[in-house]
């Protein structure tokens, strides 16, 4: 320990002569410049950064090694700093964890503030009630707590993969998807990069100060400096972290902006795709219309070709009938056969084209199915929107319930205020009546709302009936579809029957061939020819029957087509009905919203009424408090004046046996003083009273001396002055008549000023006559003033009655409150009598006070009874409101269930429509297959008919030729041999089932053989 240098006085002294750069950097060299008692002046201007710039190397070494590399005696300081930094890191982690809780607390602050405001308002009301009446304890009405469920909004956090999926769901093109995925990956990689590291370090820091007085300073200064330095390091670290967080925030905002841009692009692309799809739909519909026109044209062409074929067949028959032109007709038949083959090929080519067109139509149908699926998705979106609207309606209902609760609370407040109204005045009793009327109006409005809800329920029931009718129609349509299936099965059976008929035809042809063989064997007999003709006729008849059967089948097909079209129309009508029902439901929703708006308007009107009531009550309370204070002050002043008069009069009794009483019973009465003639009456009366007469004076002998005359003149002057002052008082009384509310105030002021005048007179005079005159005059005047005050009280009562009549016009009467008002009026009359008797006798005044206390107790008991009755009424009203609310909620739940059932029914109808459409497509495909089979059968039938006709004509010609040549020929055997040869050449005798179904090429070869023959 060194000695203190003589230069150091212990006070702050400057040490700027040593530069900062020449000072040592380590604490080991601190002995060269010992500590002083105070910090050096020059270090105050230096920043912390300059002080700690020399310790960066040590800080980096400590951070890299994790241990103290500086070998000195301050290891415990470094350990303390390290522990502080670790504690700061833990505090930062806790702060991050607490930030989440702060976010949750912010949501609760608004609720707490609203609750605080409500508590403040309730406290103010309670204080006001305590000031109004501290004696009466108002019973607390229990608050009815409804079933409230707090809305808990859980914080939904989406991961990056979910956001990526949602963004990619908007994209449909593969190229855009790949670009978007690359951008998303880059952004996610940038998100996943580690944040910038903030290097922290701990070190023992030596503040660069001069140390001169080492013996005086202690080690605590070093410790404080170390702590301050560490705190500054932590502050720098926090600043760096704040900058990093700001950068991250800006990056996230930029990314959000990019996300929003991409989302907008996706929405634009989606809108474009929708527009393109709508255009394609329109073009496909136009193409369908064109294809239908083309199909009709092709059908007309086919009909024309059929007619042409029939004409050709007729011409062929004519040509075949001509015997002379048989060969020529055969050549034409060949040409026509070739032409028919060409037409057949062309027809097959057209059929192939039609098949291709049908394939295209099927592809378009597939596209329409896809569009239908998209429409179904849109329907699901609409359903979701409907559910969202229902949720909004539920929220609105919750708001309405909250408003009802507020209305109930307002009613409770109104009831509490009505208690004070019943105790104090009739005005507030009538305001209670207003509240009852408002409650009745609310009940009526609720009844009207219930009637509207019932009407809406009836409408919903009508809609349900319509839906049931639609279901019945759908069932009928299903039955018709089943009938169509049965008819299709019948058609298939008929096709089988037609095939069987064809087989029978083939059998008939075989029989004909057999008969021909028999004719070949029995050609010698002429009767066999007739049998052959009969059998041929029978076969023709069978062919005719088959043709009729085919025509019947064609008619059945046409009828089926018509029925299918009818079913399609019925389906369209059902869809229109569904759209109409949806529109009706939307209208009902709008009506419900309108009803909710009406309910809100009624709530607002009720709130306005309550505000007006509150204002009226406040005004009445202020008026009543002022009137009471004024009345009590006036009565107290009057009591003091009366007692002072009594004492003064008792003191002024100089004569024995002559006692002047202080009561007003011995005074003469005066009635009906008019306020208009008060001044003139006062002047004349005072002059009469001033004249001395032996009748009026109390003194038996007249004044004889000059002193008495002087006294009398002096008294006369004083009396004149008193008259003038009384006139001034009356003028003041008239001027303040409208300003003052309480009529008792004027009499008190008059008495007070008169007492002052009397004191002034009595102090300067000793005349008893003058006092007696003044006393008599004052008694008369006091009576007149009392009567004037009574008239003013009557005027005030009239004004109050006018106000009551105005309020009664607005509000209805209540029996209980009217009884209370009558009791209050009786109490007021008793109080008036008490006031008049108070001026007469002091004993009666005390007795009246006791009576008034008893009356007040009775009134308080009555008020408690009334409060109980009102409380019961309020509880009943609350119970009814709860019941109506529950009924309303139950009705809303029923409506929700009904809408859910409607949605289910709509979905079921859509499914049934889809099923019917599928059946329809399947039926169409079956009908198309059936028509193709029928056409093939018709072609085979036509071919067989033509071949049979040709053979029949050839046989008839041969028979005719045989008949003609029968007489000419000499040898019948030769003719029969020729007939058999011709039959063999034609190939009739050796026909089989395979030859019946031969193509036209073989037929042409057979026709050529006939022509060669």
UniProtKB/Swiss-Prot annotation:
Q: Which GO terms describe its cellular component?
A: centriole; cytoplasm
Query: Gene3D superfamilies from the entry?
Result: 1.10.287.1490
Q: Where is the composition biased (Basic and acidic residues)?
A: 466-485
> Does the keyword Cytoplasm belong to this entry?
yes
Main localization, broad class: cytoplasm
Q: Where is this region: Disordered?
A: 1-46, 457-485
What job does this protein perform? Answer: Plays a role in centriole duplication in meiosis and mitosis. Required for daughter centrioles to acquire duplication competence and become mother centrioles, and for mother centrioles to maintain duplication competence. Regulates spd-2 centriolar localization and affects the recruitment and incorporation of downstream core components. Also required for the assembly of a peripheral centriole structure called the paddlewheel, for centriole elongation and for pericentriolar material assembly. Required to maintain pcmd-1 at the centrosome in early embryos.
**The protein's name in its UniProt record:** Spindle assembly abnormal protein 7
The gene coding this protein: sas-7
């Amino acid at each position: 320990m060194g000695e203190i240098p003589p230069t150091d006085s212990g006070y702050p002294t400057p040490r700027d002569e040593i530069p900062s750069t020449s000072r040592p950097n380590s604490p080991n060299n601190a002995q060269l410049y010992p500590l002083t008692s105070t910090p050096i002046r020059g270090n105050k201007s230096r920043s912390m950064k300059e002080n700690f710039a020399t310790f960066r190397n040590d800080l980096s070494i400590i951070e890299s090694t994790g241990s103290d590399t500086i070998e000195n005696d301050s290891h415990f300081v470094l350990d303390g700093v390290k522990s502080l930094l670790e504690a700061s890191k833990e505090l930062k982690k806790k702060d991050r964890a607490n930030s989440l809780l702060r976010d949750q607390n912010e949501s609760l602050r608004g609720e707490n503030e609203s609750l605080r405001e409500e508590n403040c308002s309730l406290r103010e009301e309670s204080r006001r009630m305590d000031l109004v009446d501290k004696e009466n304890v108002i019973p607390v009405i229990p608050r009815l707590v409804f079933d409230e469920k707090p809305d808990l909004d859980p914080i939904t956090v989406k991961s990056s993969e979910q956001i990526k999926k949602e963004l990619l769901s908007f994209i449909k093109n593969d190229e855009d998807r790949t670009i978007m995925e690359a951008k998303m990956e880059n952004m996610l990689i940038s998100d996943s990069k580690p944040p910038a590291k903030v290097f922290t370090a701990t070190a023992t820091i030596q503040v660069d100060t001069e140390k001169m007085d080492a013996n005086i300073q202690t080690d605590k200064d070093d410790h404080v400096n170390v702590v301050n330095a560490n705190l500054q390091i932590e502050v720098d670290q926090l600043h760096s972290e704040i900058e990093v967080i700001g950068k991250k925030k800006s990056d996230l905002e930029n990314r959000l902006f990019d996300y929003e841009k991409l989302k907008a692009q996706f929405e634009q692309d989606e809108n474009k795709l929708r527009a393109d799809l709508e255009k394609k739909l329109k073009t496909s519909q136009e193409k369908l219309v064109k294809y239908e026109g083309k199909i009709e044209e092709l059908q007309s062409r086919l009909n024309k070709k059929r007619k042409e074929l029939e004409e050709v067949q007729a011409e062929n028959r004519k040509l075949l009938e001509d015997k002379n032109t048989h060969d020529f007709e055969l050549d034409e038949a060949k040409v026509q056969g070739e032409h028919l083959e060409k037409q057949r090929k062309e027809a097959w080519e057209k059929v192939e084209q039609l098949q291709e067109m049908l394939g295209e139509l099927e592809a378009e149908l597939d596209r329409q199915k896809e569009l239908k699926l998209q429409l179904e998705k849109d329907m699901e979106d609409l359903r979701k929107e409907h559910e969202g609207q229902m949720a909004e309606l539920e929220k609105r209902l919750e708001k309405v319930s909250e408003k009802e609760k507020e209305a109930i609370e307002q009613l409770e407040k109104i009831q509490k205020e009505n208690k004070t109204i019943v105790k104090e005045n009739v005005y507030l009793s009538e305001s209670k009546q207003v509240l009852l009327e408002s409650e009745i109006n609310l009940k009526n409005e609720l009844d009207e709302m219930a009637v509207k809800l019932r009407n809406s329920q009836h409408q919903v029931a009508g809609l349900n009936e319509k839906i049931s009718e639609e279901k019945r129609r759908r069932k009928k349509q299903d039955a018709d579809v089943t009938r169509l299936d049965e008819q299709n099965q019948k058609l298939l059976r008929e096709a089988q029957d037609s095939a069987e008929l064809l087989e029978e035809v083939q059998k008939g042809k075989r029989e004909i061939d057999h008969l021909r063989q028999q004719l070949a064997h029995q050609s010698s007999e002429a009767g066999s020819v007739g049998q052959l003709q009969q059998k041929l006729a029978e076969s023709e008849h069978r062919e005719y029957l088959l043709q009729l059967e085919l025509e019947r089948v064609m008619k059945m097909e046409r009828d089926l087509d018509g029925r299918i079209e009818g079913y399609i129309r019925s389906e369209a009508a059902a869809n229109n009905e569904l759209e109409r029902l949806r529109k009706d439901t939307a209208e009902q929703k709008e009506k419900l919203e309108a009803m909710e708006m009406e309910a809100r308007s009624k709530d607002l009107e009720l709130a306005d009424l309550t505000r007006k009531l509150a204002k009226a009550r406040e005004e009445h309370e202020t008026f009543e408090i002022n009137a009471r204070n004024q009345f009590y002050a006036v009565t107290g002043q009057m009591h003091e004046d009366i007692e002072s008069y009594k004492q003064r009069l008792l003191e002024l009794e100089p004569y024995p046996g002559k006692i002047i009483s202080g009561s007003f019973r011995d005074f003469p009465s005066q009635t009906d003083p008019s306020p208009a003639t008060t001044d003139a009456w006062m002047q004349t009366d005072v002059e009469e009273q001033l004249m001395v007469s032996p009748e009026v004076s109390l003194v038996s002998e007249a004044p004889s001396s000059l002193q008495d005359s002087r006294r009398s003149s002096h008294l006369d002057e004083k009396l004149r002055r008193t008259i003038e002052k009384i006139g001034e008082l009356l003028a003041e009384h008239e001027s303040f008549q409208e300003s003052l509310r309480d009529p008792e105030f004027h009499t008190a002021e008059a008495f007070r000023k008169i007492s002052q005048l009397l004191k002034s007179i009595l102090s300067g005079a000793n005349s008893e006559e003058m006092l007696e005159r003044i006393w008599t005059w004052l008694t008369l005047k006091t009576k007149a003033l009392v009567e004037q005050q009574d008239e003013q009280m009557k005027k005030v009562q009239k004004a109050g009655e006018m106000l009551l009549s105005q309020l009664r016009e607005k509000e209805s009467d209540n029996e209980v409150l009217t009884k209370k008002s009558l009791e209050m009026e009786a109490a007021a009359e008793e109080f008036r009598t008490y006031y008049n008797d108070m001026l007469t006798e002091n004993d009666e005044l005390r007795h009246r006070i006791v009576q008034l206390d008893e009356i007040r107790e009775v009134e308080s008991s009555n008020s408690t009874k009334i409060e109980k009755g009102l409380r019961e009424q309020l509880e009943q009203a609350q119970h009814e409101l709860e019941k109506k609310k529950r009924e309303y909620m139950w009705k809303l739940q029923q409506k929700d269930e009904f809408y859910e059932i409607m949605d289910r029914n709509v979905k079921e109808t859509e499914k049934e429509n889809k099923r019917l459409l599928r059946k329809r497509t399947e039926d169409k495909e079956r009908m198309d297959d059936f028509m193709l089979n029928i056409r093939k059968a018709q072609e085979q039938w036509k071919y067989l008919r033509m071949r049979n006709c040709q053979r029949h004509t050839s046989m008839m010609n041969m028979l005719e030729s045989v008949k003609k040549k029968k007489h000419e020929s000499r040898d019948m055997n030769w003719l029969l041999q020729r007939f058999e040869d011709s039959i063999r050449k034609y190939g009739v005798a050796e026909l089989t089932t395979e030859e019946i179904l031969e193509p036209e090429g073989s037929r042409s070869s057979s026709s050529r053989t006939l022509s060669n023959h």
